[in-house]
Design a protein with these regions (language model features):
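Short, glycine/acidic-enriched loop or turn micro-motifs at the edges of active sites
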Residues: 77
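Hydrophobic/aromatic beta-strand patches that form the interior of the parallel beta-sheet core
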Residues: 4-6, 71, 126
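Mg2+-dependent endonuclease catalytic cores in nucleic-acid-processing enzymes, primarily RNase H-like
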Residues: 92-206, 227-243
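ATPase catalytic-site recognition across NTP-hydrolyzing enzymes
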Residues: 13-73
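Short loop/turn segments immediately following beta-strands, especially the blade-tip
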Residues: 87-91
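Short beta-strand scaffold segments in enzyme catalytic cores
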Residues: 81-86
């Protein structure tokens, strides 16, 4: 017997009038309103980010040439490798997630080929502390494998300026920017929003499942001070990247 999922929205329940919908939405937490009205899955109790997609989502745009760019990556094999790129408007201290990538059971070469086109050879990449672990085949640190394929990984693993690198500190930092309207994500990055909706705590502890892109974005966020503008070969007014 096969199984399948059907998404139902308020349009499928004609007995609900506009006034009924307004009353229900008013009594529903913001981060659950899309789930209630449009059938989009979202964790309820224990959500790490009690926000809706619309609190973060923005339409893609060409990133101005002077904005700083930084990438972040989270290593993985059976659980996916993930990468994210942030663009930082330092004039307003607003951060935009412009690109993301997630793939499991692929080699560093495959990942590097997929993400190197986002920026330029000097794009700085933040990475987690497990990148210092030595590989079983040739003894090279995991981070070095990505350097050997041409990516500009930062000299040390991701941490804040004060040296801290805890999970909670990174998540709370991102949350502050999100709630202030200063962490945005391009609307078409569906894989990121899937993780964003389901990221949750159990017994007060963050569940480390299906959070690969969030982790990659978190490492980039922690190292945004190392972001750089893409060198320009033409007039500076040209956009750095196209989404």
């Amino acid at each position: 017997m096969s199984k399948y999922v059907v998404t139902a929205t308020w349009d499928d329940v004609p007995h609900l009038g506009d006034e009924d919908k307004a009353d229900i939405l008013a009594s529903t937490p913001p981060h659950l309103r899309d789930a209630r009205s449009r059938g989009i899955p979202h964790i309820g109790s224990g959500a790490v980010f009690p926000l809706s997609d619309d609190d973060l989502a923005c339409e893609p745009f060409e990133v101005p040439a002077h904005w700083a760019l930084v990438g972040g990556m989270d290593f993985g094999w059976d659980h996916p490798f993930a990468a994210a790129m942030l663009a930082h408007d330092r004039d307003t201290d607003t951060i935009y997630l412009t690109h993301c990538y997630r793939q499991k059971q692929a080699t560093p070469l495959i990942h590097c080929e997929a993400i190197r086109k986002w920026g330029w050879p000097g794009l700085p990449w933040a990475w987690p502390h497990d990148g210092n672990q030595h590989g079983k085949s040739d003894g090279r640190p995991l981070a070095q494998l990505y350097r050997d394929h041409g990516l500009n990984l930062l000299s040390d693993f991701a941490r804040f300026a004060d040296g801290s690198y805890g999970l909670e500190a990174g998540i709370m930092g991102m949350m502050e920017y999100m709630q202030a309207g200063r962490f945005k994500a391009f609307r078409h990055l569906s894989e990121f929003f899937e993780e964003f909706r389901m990221y949750h705590r159990k017994n007060g502890v963050i569940v480390k499942e299906r959070e690969d892109l969030i982790s990659a974005a978190r490492y980039a966020f922690m190292c945004r001070r190392f972001g750089e503008a893409k060198p320009q070969s033409g007039p500076a007014r040209l956009a750095v990247i196209r989404y």
